[in-house]
């Protein structure tokens, strides 16, 4: 297992809109860390490190969050949970982090990536994508950052469903039925 990336944050005292506005004026991002035991800690962090970390790990990869509470530091495995963006400036305005237990499965929405050109599309069929992400359950360190689906052998009238996905060991889809992910259909007017 490779070393987890770490984000250093500070516990914040000021709460509410006014305090958060003052933080943003100093190019800090307010947030909340919800630990695995259910406690929440209001935090603040520098903008650049959190942006770089988000680019590197996204919403599906676990990392360590180091909380500095007036000199007392504690480190916890975490995931990005909810992110609010500034409506104009396209930067973070508030971030919630979710603490995780590395031994317990978590549920996360994982993006799907489609590769290759389907055989059915090459002969005139139309590719229809029904889902672009899927809820996945796995231990945090086994969670895939994306699920890659090869479309090369997909012919007209064929479908790739949830049960057809290459999920790997310890990873399962959270779905109550075997719904379609992607299909190649006949062009309009043909059967």
Swiss-Prot record:
InterPro entries: Rbsml_bL25/Gln-tRNA_synth_N (IPR020056), Ribosomal_bL25/Gln-tRNA_synth (IPR011035), Ribosomal_bL25_b-dom (IPR020057), Ribosomal_bL25_C (IPR037121), Ribosomal_bL25_long (IPR001021), Ribosomal_L25_dom (IPR029751), Ribosomal_uL5_bac-type (IPR020930). Disulfide bonds: none annotated. The keyword Ribonucleoprotein applies. GO terms for biological process: translation. One of its GO terms (molecular function) is 5S rRNA binding. Keywords: Ribonucleoprotein, Ribosomal protein, RNA-binding, rRNA-binding. GO terms for cellular component: cytosolic large ribosomal subunit. Part of the 50S ribosomal subunit; part of the 5S rRNA/L5/L18/L25 subcomplex. Contacts the 5S rRNA. Binds to the 5S rRNA independently of L5 and L18. Belongs to the bacterial ribosomal protein bL25 family. CTC subfamily. This is one of the proteins that binds to the 5S RNA in the ribosome where it forms part of the central protuberance. This is Large ribosomal subunit protein bL25. It comes from Nitratidesulfovibrio vulgaris (strain DSM 19637 / Miyazaki F). The lineage of its organism: Bacteria, Pseudomonadati, Thermodesulfobacteriota, Desulfovibrionia, Desulfovibrionales. The gene is rplY.
């Amino acid at each position: 297992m490779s070393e987890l990336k770490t984000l250093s944050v500070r516990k914040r005292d000021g709460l509410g809109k006014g305090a958060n506005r003052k933080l943003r004026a100093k190019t800090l991002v307010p947030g909340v860390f919800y630990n695995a035991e259910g406690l929440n800690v209001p935090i603040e962090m520098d903008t650049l490190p959190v942006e770089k970390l988000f680019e590197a790990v996204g919403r599906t990869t676990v990392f360590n969050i180091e909380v500095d509470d007036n000199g007392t530091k504690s480190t916890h495995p975490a995931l990005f949970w909810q992110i609010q963006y500034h409506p104009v400036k396209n930067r973070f305005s508030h971030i919630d982090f979710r603490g995780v237990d590395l031994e317990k499965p978590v549920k996360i929405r994982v993006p799907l990536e489609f590769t290759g050109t389907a055989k059915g599309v090459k002969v005139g069929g139309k590719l229809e994508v029904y889902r672009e992400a899927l809820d996945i359950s796995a231990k945090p360190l086994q969670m895939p950052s994306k699920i890659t689906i090869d479309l090369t052998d997909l012919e007209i009238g064929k479908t790739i469903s949830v049960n057809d996905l290459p999920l790997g060991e310890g990873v399962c889809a959270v779905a109550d039925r075997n719904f379609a992910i992607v299909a190649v259909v006949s062009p309009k007017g043909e059967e």
